């Protein structure tokens, strides 16, 4: 994971549903994105396609390890859709939604999230 989230911003007591995705709001298109329904539950998750302002942090929760394993095997066996030639976790959440799973997010304040994915981002973080 190439993201640092300040201490206290992510709490296991928030975890609920079949899946849970910590998010923050940011610019750009190099994220996975989450769209919520009118009740605040996840309605859609897309990799590298901006469907809302909610960007995933790259940390993901599934209710059980077995659920993750089952989703991975079923999705990539039936629908091996790759994004830029790579496998991502985001499509597993969309697949979980198609199986009537419930997924929630947390919305972490952007100033508490420090992206470290490039040398420039790391340098900026170290200088702060």
Regions found by a protein language model. Give the residues of each.
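Catalytic-core segments of class I nucleotidyltransferases/pyrophosphorylases
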Residues: 42-114, 120-123, 127-128
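Conserved beta-loop-beta/alpha segment of the NTase-like Rossmann-fold superfamily
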Residues: 1-33, 38
């Amino acid at each position: 994971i190439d993201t640092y989230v300040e201490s206290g911003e992510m709490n296991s007591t928030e975890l609920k549903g079949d899946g849970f995705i910590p998010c923050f709001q940011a610019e750009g298109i190099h994220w996975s994105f989450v769209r919520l329904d009118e009740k605040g539950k996840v309605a859609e998750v897309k990799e590298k396609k901006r469907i809302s302002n909610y960007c995933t942090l790259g940390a993901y929760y599934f209710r059980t390890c077995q659920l993750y394993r089952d989703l991975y095997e079923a999705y990539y066996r039936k629908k091996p859709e790759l994004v830029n030639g790579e496998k991502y976790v985001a499509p597993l959440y969309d697949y979980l939604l198609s199986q009537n799973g419930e997924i929630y997010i947390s919305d972490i304040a952007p100033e508490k999230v420090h992206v470290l994915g490039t040398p420039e981002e790391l340098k900026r973080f170290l200088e702060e």
